[in-house]
Amino acid sequence: MAKKSMIARDAKRKKMVERFAAKRSALMAAFNAAEDPMERLEIHRKIQGLPRNSAPTRMRNRCWATGKPRGVYRDFGLCRNQLRERAHKGELPGVVKSSW
């Protein structure tokens, strides 16, 4: 189980990303469309002025059951240990033990 403070920090970052997503995407579109170097520099400064935690790259994929940050499968949102346990119990629809 991950520390509760780290889970809370990631939840806070997720909210921040959602709150600034529209503004950040509008600025990025303007930045990519601008051809004048001075205009691009001005837009870049505006992007840098946004909160650091509003960037989507600062979010971390975590297991929703345990909060572990590593070994998380995107399709399920579970870490490898939880995925294995729940698959053996039959709690994951469509997941079967392989045999060949």
Swiss-Prot record:
Superkingdom assignment: Bacteria
Any single GO BP term: translation
PROSITE patterns registered for this protein in UniProt: RIBOSOMAL_S14
Keywords: Ribonucleoprotein, Ribosomal protein, RNA-binding, rRNA-binding
InterPro entries linked: Ribosomal_uS14 (IPR001209), Ribosomal_uS14_bac/plastid (IPR023036), Ribosomal_uS14_CS (IPR018271)
Gene Ontology CC terms, in alphabetical order: cytoplasm; small ribosomal subunit
Molecular function terms, GO-annotated: rRNA binding; structural constituent of ribosome
Keyword Ribonucleoprotein: yes
NCBIfam families, per database record: PRK08881.1 (NF006477)
Function as written in the Swiss-Prot or TrEMBL entry: Binds 16S rRNA, required for the assembly of 30S particles and may also be responsible for determining the conformation of the 16S rRNA at the A site.
Record family assignment: Belongs to the universal ribosomal protein uS14 family.
Quaternary structure (record): Part of the 30S ribosomal subunit. Contacts proteins S3 and S10.
Protein name per Swiss-Prot or TrEMBL: Small ribosomal subunit protein uS14
